[in-house]
C-alpha cells in the first residue's frame, strides 16, 4: 500500500535516518532516489564501507518499477508516493533519528515527519507480518529464532578459511557482509570477517587466528550455534567424538594485548648497556596496548642512544615499535612474552649467548640452571639456561646451533633485528582471590581414581620404564617420589619415580619387580591407577593371555610367612583381621644384600573358619578363596592346620615344618619323637614329630619327601596352566592388538579357552566401562574360536583403528569386559554416541554349549535371519538357537563326506580321490582367511530356463547375513552382478545374473565352483573353477 498525498508538494532533499532490522553487524547502506513527479532521475544503493555499490539511471521510469527492486531485496515495502520528491535515506544499526535543515518550513516539516513515520510503520508492519512467506522462509539473520545450528568438519584447507553452509547462509542478506564473533566454550571471543566469494559466505580474516589458538586440527568437528547479535557459540570436538580440551593458547583474540594483566614485555639485547637496563613496568593492567608500545619505544630510544657501534645499526624506534606491535598481536600466549632484539654479538661472539632480564628469569625460571626447548617451524632445539658468575641470566649452550639453523646472520638487516619470543612452559599462578578459570571437567571423562595405560616390554625394559605423557597429566604436577606397584599376586613393590627430560621414569625398584615376575621381551603390562600413588598391574605374555606369576615369585621371595610383626589371639577370627596387601621392600640387583623382605603382616595364629593358620599369616585374595572352597569340601569336625610353604620348609637343611604351640596343645597329644602318617593322593609318608625346648613343634625326617624344587621350564608351563585355570574363578584376562583384518572378526587365543572349561555360549556379551553391552556371536573355524557376527558393529561403534590394544576380562558368565587403549598406551575415551548401537545386559543368560574335541573346521554360529542393517540379535531368538557345538560338528561330518581344510561343501557332496586332491591343492593356493564355499555343478545349475546355485545354510548364516542383495562375482578381472536372496529353508540362492555368468564362463556339468568371499569389497566373491576333465 503506497502512501498518498492530496496535492503534489516539493520536498527539499533531507536525510531520513532509521534503523532496519535486517542489517548484519555494523554494515549500513544508503539508498538515494532523486526525481520529480512520476519519473525518477536515478537511484543508487551504496554500502557505506565503500566496498559494494550499485545504481541505475531511471530516466522516464515510473518510481514503482525502481522501488520494486528495493522491495525485491526486502529493504522497503511496496509502492512509493507519486509526487515530486528528492529523498535520501540511510539504513543503519542505530536508533531512529530525523535530521532536517533549520530553515525548513513548519508545514514541510510536518509533512516530512508524517512521511517518515508512515514509511517506518509500513516497513515494520511488513517485517512482522506473519503471512510473509519470504521472510519466514529465509529465516532472517536477527530474528527471534536464535537457536540455529550448523556443523563443519575440518578438512582440506580449513586453516585459511571456512565456508558457511549454503542453507544456513540464506539467513544472510545477499548484499550483507561484515564481522561476526565466535565464542568458544572457555568464554573467549574472536572477531572474524565474513566475505562473499562465488555466492558463498566465507570466514576469512581472523579465522586462522581462531583455528590456531584453539589448536584445531584435521578431522576436528565444530558445531556452531547462532545466539543473536552476530555472535556464534562454537563447540569443538576431536575425531574421537569427545569435547576437545581448551588449549592454553585460547585467549580473547583481538583484545589480547589489553587483557594481558600484569604480563610485561621485555626488550633487551646482549650489550652490557642493555644488560643493565630494567624491564618494563608491570603497570600494564589498565594501560592500553598503544601506551605499552610507546613505553617500549621510549625505552628503546634510551638504549639506542647509549649503545655501542653495533647498536648504531639499530633501525628507528618507530620501525621497531611497529614490528613489536605486530608480533605482540600475532602471538596469543597466556604467559608473559620476552622480547630480545638480536644484535651482532648474539650471533657471532664466542661464546654465543642471549641474555634474559633478571626479573623475568627469576619469575619463570626459578630452578636455576636447566635445559629449555626452543621451537620454531615445527623443529626443536635444546638450549641451556644458566646463571653466570656475574649473575647474568642467559641462554648459552645450544644457542649457536639455533642461530645457525635459522640463518641468523649479523650482516642481514632482517637478521640483525629479528625479534624472538620465548613463551615459558611454566604457568604463572595467580594470587588467591583473583578470578581463575575453572578446569575443563568434561575433557576428563572420569576422576583420577581409575586411569589406565599399557606398556609393551621392549628395549631395555629391565632397568626402567617410562610413563606416557598423557597419563602423567592426571597427577596434575604432584607426584610422589615413590609409587607402589601391585600385581595380581597381592604383593606390593615400592618403585622410585624420577623425572628425566620432563618424562616420568620408574627407576630404582623396577628391576626387582621385573625379576620377581619374570618379565620377558614382548610381555604386555596394563596399569590401573587407583589413587594414593598405587598402580595395579596386569601382566600378559605375547600370546595375549594373562601371565602366571606364582612360579617366578617363588624364585624372588626368600621368606614368605615369616617375620610378621602384629600379634592377635588365636581365638580371633581371620575375618576380623585388618585386610591389607602384603608389602615387600626391594633393592636393586646392583646393591649388595639383595633380598625382598616382608615388612607387614598380622602375627598371631588365626582361626580360618575351621582352619588354624600360623601367626601373622596373610593370604592373597586368590589363595583365600581357594582355601575357603577346600575347607568347605573337606567337612572336618576337627579344626585343620594350614601353613604357607617357605624356603626352609622345602629346601632347608634340615627340612622341617613347624606347628604352632597352641594347635599342638589342643589337637596333637603325641609323645616327643612319635611317628605320624601323612597321606596325599592314595600315598602315605612317615614323619617324626618333635617338641623342642623353645616350645616349637616340628615335623622332620620324612617330610623332606614333600620338598618343592625350583621349577624348570616344563614345570613353569604346568604351573601356569594349573594356576591360570584355578585362580580366582572370575576375571581371566587376555589382550588383542588390532592388526590385519581385525574389522571382520577377532580370534580368541587358544590358551584362554581353558577358562571356559570346555563350554562357551553361542553369544558372548562385550561390556565397556560405561556399562553398555554388545552381543557378538561365536563361531569355530579351522580349529579356532572367533567373535564374528556383531563384532564389526562393535568395531565401528568404538572407532577401533589399526594398532589399538584391547584388554578382555572374562567374568565367568559369558561376558567379556573390554578396555580399549590407543597406540599411545592410554585408554581411549568415547562419546555417548556409541550407546545407540549397544544393548544393555539382561538378567537371563543362555545355556552354555559344550566344546568337544570332536568339533572340526566347520563354523558353529547359530543360524539367524538378519538383515544387513541389523547389528544386535533379539534375545528371544537367541534363547531358541542355543545348541551343542559338538552336535553341529557331527552334522558337519554328515554334510561333508570328504572334508577339505578351509572349504565348506553342501550336504551329501561326494568327491573322488582325484577331485579331493585337486580341491585341496586349489584351496591351499588361494590362501583365503575366510572359508571358501564349494559346490559341484549339476544340470539345473548350467542348463534350463531357471539356472540357480544354492549356498548351504551353514555358510550363509555366518558369512552372508542378509536377506536379499546384489552380489558381485569376479573372474579373470571381469565382474557380474548376481542377485542373492534367502529361501524358506534359510539357504541363499544365486538367481538373476547367474545364467549369464555360467554362459560367459562356459561352465559344464561336473565342474567344481569355489566361491571366495573378499574382505576388501563388501559381499563380492572371486570364483575359481575346477573343470571336470
Curated annotation (Swiss-Prot):
Compositionally biased tracts (Polar residues): 591-605, 852-867
One cellular component term from this protein's GO annotations in UniProt: nucleus
Disordered as annotated region, ranges: 572-605, 852-882
Source organism, top-level taxon: Eukaryota
GO molecular function: DNA binding
Keywords for the protein's UniProt record, in alphabetical order: DNA-binding, Nucleus, Repeat, Transcription, Transcription regulation
Entry-linked InterPro entries: B3_DNA-bd (IPR003340), DNA-bd_pseudobarrel_sf (IPR015300), REM16-like (IPR044837)
Pfam families in the cross-refs: B3
Protein name: Putative B3 domain-containing protein Os03g0621600
UniProt source species: Oryza sativa subsp. japonica (Rice)
Lineage: Eukaryota, Viridiplantae, Streptophyta, Embryophyta, Tracheophyta
Amino acid at each position: 500500500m503506497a502512501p498518498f498525498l492530496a496535492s503534489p508538494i516539493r520536498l527539499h532533499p533531507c536525510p531520513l535516518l532509521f534503523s532496519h532490522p535486517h542489517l548484519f553487524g555494523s554494515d549500513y547502506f544508503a539508498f538515494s532516489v532523486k526525481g520529480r513527479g512520476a519519473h525518477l532521475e536515478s537511484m543508487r544503493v551504496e554500502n557505506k564501507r565503500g566496498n559494494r555499490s550499485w545504481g541505475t539511471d531511471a530516466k522516464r521510469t515510473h518510481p514503482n518499477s525502481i522501488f520494486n527492486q528495493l522491495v525485491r531485496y526486502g529493504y522497503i515495502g511496496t509502492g512509493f508516493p507519486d509526487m515530486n520528491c528528492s529523498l535520501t535515506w540511510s539504513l543503519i544499526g542505530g536508533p531512529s533519528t530525523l535530521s532536517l535543515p533549520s530553515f525548513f518550513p513548519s508545514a514541510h516539516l510536518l509533512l516530512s515527519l508524517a512521511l517518515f513515520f508512515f514509511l517506518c510503520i509500513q516497513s515494520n508492519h511488513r517485517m512482522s507480518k506473519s503471512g510473509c512467506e519470504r521472510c519466514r522462509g529465509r529465516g532472517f539473520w536477527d530474528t527471534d529464532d536464535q537457536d540455529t545450528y550448523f556443523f563443519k568438519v575440518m578438512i582440506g584447507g580449513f586453516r585459511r578459511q571456512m565456508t558457511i553452509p549454503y542453507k544456513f547462509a540464506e539467513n544472510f542478506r545477499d548484499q550483507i557482509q561484515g564481522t561476526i564473533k565466535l565464542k568458544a566454550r572457555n568464554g573467549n571471543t574472536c572477531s572474524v570477517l565474513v566475505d562473499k566469494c562465488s555466492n558463498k559466505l566465507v570466514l576469512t580474516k581472523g579465522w586462522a587466528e581462531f583455528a590456531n589458538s584453539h589448536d584445531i586440527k584435521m578431522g576436528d568437528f565444530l558445531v556452531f550455534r547462532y545466539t543473536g547479535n552476530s555472535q556464534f557459540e562454537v563447540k569443538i570436538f576431536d575425531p574421537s567424538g569427545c569435547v576437545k580440551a581448551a588449549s592454553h593458547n585460547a585467549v580473547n583474540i583481538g583484545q589480547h594485548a589489553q587483557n594481558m594483566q600484569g604480563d610485561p614485555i621485555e626488550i633487551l639485547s646482549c650489550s652490557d648497556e642493555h644488560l643493565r637496563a630494567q624491564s618494563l613496568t608491570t603497570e600494564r593492567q589498565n594501560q592500553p596496548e598503544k601506551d605499552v608500545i610507546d613505553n617500549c619505544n621510549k625505552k628503546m630510544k634510551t638504549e639506542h642512544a647509549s649503545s655501542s657501534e653495533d647498536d648504531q645499526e639499530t633501525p628507528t624506534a618507530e620501525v621497531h615499535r611497529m614490528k613489536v606491535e605486530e608480533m605482540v598481536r600475532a602471538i596469543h600466549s597466556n604467559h608473559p612474552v620476552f622480547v630480545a632484539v638480536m644484535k651482532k654479538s648474539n650471533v657471532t661472539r664466542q661464546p654465543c649467548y642471549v641474555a634474559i632480564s633478571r626479573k623475568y628469569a627469576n619469575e619463570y625460571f626459578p630452578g636455576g640452571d636447566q635445559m629449555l626447548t626452543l621451537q620454531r617451524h615445527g623443529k626443536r632445539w635444546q638450549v641451556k639456561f644458566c646463571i653466570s658468575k656475574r649473575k647474568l641470566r642467559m641462554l648459552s649452550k645450544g644457542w649457536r646451533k639455533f642461530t645457525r639453523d635459522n640463518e641468523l646472520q649479523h650482516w642481514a638487516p632482517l637478521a640483525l633485528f629479528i625479534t624472538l619470543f620465548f613463551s615459558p612452559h611454566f604457568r604463572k599462578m595467580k594470587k588467591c582471590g583473583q578470578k581463575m578459570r575453572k578446569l575443563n571437567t568434561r575433557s576428563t571423562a572420569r576422576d583420577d581414581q581409575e586411569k589406565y595405560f599399557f606398556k609393551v616390554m621392549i628395549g631395555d625394559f629391565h632397568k626402567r620404564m617410562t610413563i606416557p605423557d598423557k597419563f602423567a597429566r592426571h597427577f596434575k604436577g604432584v607426584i610422589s617420589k615413590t609409587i607402589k606397584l601391585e600385581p595380581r599376586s597381592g604383593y606390593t613393590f615400592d618403585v622410585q619415580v624420577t623425572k628425566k627430560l620432563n618424562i616420568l621414569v620408574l627407576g630404582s625398584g623396577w628391576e626387582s619387580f621385573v625379576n620377581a615376575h619374570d618379565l620377558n621381551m614382548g610381555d604386555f603390562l596394563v596399569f590401573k591407577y587407583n589413587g594414593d600413588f598405587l598402580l595395579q598391574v596386569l601382566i600378559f605374555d605375547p600370546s595375549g593371555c594373562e601371565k602366571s606369576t606364582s612360579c617366578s615369585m617363588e624364585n624372588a621371595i626368600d621368606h614368605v610367612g615369616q617375620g610378621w610383626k602384629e600379634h592377635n589371639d588365636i581365638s580371633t577370627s581371620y575375618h576380623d583381621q585388618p585386610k591389607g596387601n602384603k608389602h615387600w621392600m626391594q633393592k636393586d640387583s646392583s646393591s649388595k644384600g639383595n633380598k625382598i623382605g616382608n615388612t607387614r603382616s598380622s602375627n598371631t595364629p588365626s582361626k580360618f573358619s575351621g582352619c588354624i593358620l600360623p601367626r601373622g599369616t596373610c593370604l592373597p585374595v586368590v589363595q583365600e578363596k581357594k582355601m575357603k572352597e577346600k575347607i568347605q569340601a573337606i567337612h572336618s569336625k576337627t579344626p585343620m592346620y594350614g601353613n604357607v610353604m617357605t624356603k626352609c620348609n622345602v629346601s632347608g637343611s634340615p627340612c622341617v615344618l613347624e606347628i604352632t604351640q597352641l594347635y599342638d596343645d589342643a589337637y596333637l597329644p603325641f609323645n616327643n619323637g612319635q611317628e605320624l602318617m601323612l597321606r596325599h593322593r592314595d600315598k602315605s609318608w612317615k614323619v617324626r614329630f618333635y617338641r623342642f625346648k623353645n616350645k616349637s613343634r616340628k615335623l622332620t625326617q620324612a617330610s623332606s619327601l614333600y620338598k618343592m624344587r625350583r621349577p624348570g621350564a616344563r614345570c613353569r608351563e604346568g604351573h601356569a596352566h594349573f594356576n591360570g585355570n584355578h585362580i580366582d574363578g572370575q576375571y581371566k584376562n587376555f589382550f588383542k592388538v588390532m592388526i590385519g583384518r581385525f574389522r571382520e572378526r577377532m580370534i580368541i587365543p587358544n590358551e584362554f579357552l581353558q577358562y571356559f572349561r570346555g563350554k562357551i555360549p553361542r553369544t558372548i556379551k562385550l561390556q565397556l566401562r560405561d556399562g553398555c553391552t554388545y552381543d557378538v556371536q561365536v563361531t569355530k573355524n579351522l580349529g579356532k574360536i572367533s567373535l564374528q557376527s556383531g563384532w564389526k558393529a562393535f568395531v565401528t561403534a568404538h572407532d577401533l583403528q589399526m594398532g589399538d590394544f584391547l584388554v578382555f576380562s572374562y567374568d565367568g558368565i559369558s561376558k567379556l569386559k573390554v578396555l580399549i587403549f590407543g597406540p599411545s598406551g592410554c585408554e581411549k575415551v568415547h562419546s555417548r554416541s556409541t550407546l545407540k548401537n549397544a544393548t544393555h545386559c539382561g538378567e537371563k543368560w543362555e545355556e552354555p554349549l559344550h566344546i568337544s574335541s570332536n568339533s572340526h573346521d566347520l563354523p558353529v554360529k547359530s543360524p539367524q535371519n538378519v538383515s544387513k542393517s541389523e547389528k544386535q540379535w533379539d534375545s528371544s531368538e537367541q534363547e531358541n538357537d542355543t545348541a551343542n557345538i559338538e552336535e553341529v560338528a557331527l552334522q558337519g561330518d554328515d554334510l561333508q563326506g570328504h572334508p577339505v581344510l578351509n572349504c565348506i561343501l553342501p550336504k551329501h557332496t561326494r568327491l573322488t580321490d582325484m577331485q579331493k586332491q585337486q580341491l585341496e591343492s586349489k584351496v591351499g593356493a588361494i590362501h583365503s582367511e575366510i572359508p571358501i564355499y564349494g559346490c559341484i555343478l549339476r544340470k539345473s545349475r548350467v542348463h534350463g530356463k531357471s539356472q540357480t546355485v544354492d549356498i548351504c545354510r551353514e555358510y550363509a548364516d555366518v558369512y552372508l547375513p542378509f536377506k536379499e542383495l546384489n552380489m558381485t562375482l569376479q573372474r579373470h578381472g571381469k565382474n557380474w552382478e548376481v542377485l542373492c536372496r534367502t529361501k524358506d529353508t534359510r539357504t541363499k540362492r544365486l538367481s538373476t545374473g547367474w545364467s549369464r555368468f555360467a554362459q560367459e564362463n562356459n561352465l559344464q556339468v561336473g565342474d567344481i565352483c569355489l566361491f571366495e568371499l573378499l574382505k576388501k569389497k563388501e559381499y563380492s566373491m572371486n570364483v575359481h573353477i575346477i573343470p571336470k576333465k
